[in-house]
Amino acid sequence: MKSLQKGFTLIELMIVVAIIGILAAFAIPAYNDYIARSQAAEGLTLADGLKIRIADHLENGSCTEDANAGAGEKGNEDKGKYALAVIEGDYAQNATDLKPEDKNGCKVVITYGQGTAGSKISKLIDTKVLELEQLVNGSYTQGDATTLDAKFIPNAVKKSQ
């Protein structure tokens, strides 16, 4: 009488484990990039919220709430879960021929890892900085002091290479 085979052989199981390992080798780094990119996007959301404050401050001729206030003073920052955004810079109020695409002198410096959930931030963006320079038309462009990897910078503010 023939015996029936029940279950899988060891070779079949080893092949399945190897395939899962290969898939995981590609999936885990892609997932880590996805997490870092989503956390980095929070910084741009914070900066967009500061646009209104900057516009209010510009009516008084300064980028910050008080012309004598330094970075981090009340009204000049916004803290999120993964980042801290701070208004800095000197308003170019004496420039007479500024075009909408020119910089107005105001900056928002976003430092990752200084938010309320600092220990849960991706290691790929922790302690990195995204500097956004405000244009006359109110939009932002990437500043030179940026240390955040280009692949994590939102396309809306990324410098054209």
From Swiss-Prot:
Annotated GO biological process: cell adhesion; type IV pilus-dependent motility
UniProt keyword annotations, A-Z: Disulfide bond, Fimbrium, Membrane, Methylation, Transmembrane, Transmembrane helix
Signal peptide residues on this chain, from the entry's feature table: none
PROSITE patterns assigned to the protein according to its UniProt record, in alphabetical order: PROKAR_NTER_METHYL
Compartment(s) where it occurs, according to its Swiss-Prot or TrEMBL record: Fimbrium; Membrane
Propeptide: 1-7
Disulfide cross-links: 63-106
Record has Membrane as a keyword: yes
Residues that bear N-methylphenylalanine: 8
Domain of life the protein comes from: Bacteria
Classification via InterPro entries: N_methyl_site, Pilin, Pilin-like, T4P/T2SS_Core
Membrane-spanning residues: 8-28
Keyword Transmembrane helix set for record: yes
Membrane topology term: Single-pass membrane protein
Any one cellular-component term (Gene Ontology): membrane
Main location class: other
Subunit structure: The pili are polar flexible filaments of about 5.4 nanometers diameter and 2.5 micrometers average length; they consist of only a single polypeptide chain arranged in a helical configuration of five subunits per turn in the assembled pilus.
PANTHER family: GENERAL SECRETION PATHWAY PROTEIN G, PREPILIN PEPTIDASE-DEPENDENT PROTEIN D
Family the entry assigns: Belongs to the N-Me-Phe pilin family.
Function statement: Major component of the type IV fimbriae that plays an essential role in twitching motility, natural transformation, and protease secretion.
Protein name per UniProt: Type IV major fimbrial protein FimA
Annotated source species: Dichelobacter nodosus (Bacteroides nodosus)
